[in-house]
Amino acid sequence: MTHMLRAPAPALALVALALVSSAAPAAPSDPTAQDTSALQFHGFRAGARLGELDGLIHRLDGGRLRCDRARRDRRVSECRSTLRDSALGGAVKVWVSAIDSVAGVITLSAGVDAQTLDRWKRRLESRYGRVGAKPQGSQWMMQWVRRGRMLRLTWRTDRGERTASVSLVDGRVLDEWGRKRAAAASP
């Protein structure tokens, strides 16, 4: 039985990002503006529009992103897909939390062997720099932060099976959502 790492809930992502954002410079007001600090993994990047992510999944294996709108805030979409890609080690589950069709949080999760996990680590470290792996309960994680964005590689072994996930968070998208919610709630 494979134990999947859970995708962060939007509220949890906001709390985690508040800690990350406090040390980051102020974000531009346009949450979809492109710049070179965009953290990405295998073409997936937080801050991408849902159409871009759906196209990427379709190009990788022909699948599609399936989205449901939140009942409480119709601007929020929770999307899922599964893709098969040999470069990622096989079947990968994809979760996206989007606000106004822009991805604030993306999580890719898969059962991996040691070689695949090492390949994921090397790919990220060669692109973003070496960071030490840190224990987090029964899991291990490596994290990179750039200009209000975060990429985290997390892995664990449970009953002999290794599961890894990459989470990409765009604080600009989540911060803008928080500002709009606060403005709508104030009299």
Go through the PLM ranges and name each one.
Residues 2-12:
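Bacterial N-terminal signal peptides that target proteins for export
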Residues 10-20:
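Bacterial N-terminal signal peptides
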Residues 22-26:
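C-terminal region of N-terminal signal peptides and the immediate post-cleavage residues
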Residues 27-77, 107-187:
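Non-cytosolic coordination micro-motifs
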Residues 72-86, 90:
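A low-complexity, Ser/Thr/Gly/Pro-enriched, surface-exposed linker/loop concept
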Residues 92-97, 153-155:
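Hydrophobic/aromatic beta-strand elements that line small-molecule binding cavities or substrate pockets
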Residues 99-107:
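Glycine-rich, often proline-containing surface loops adjacent to acidic residues and nearby aromatics
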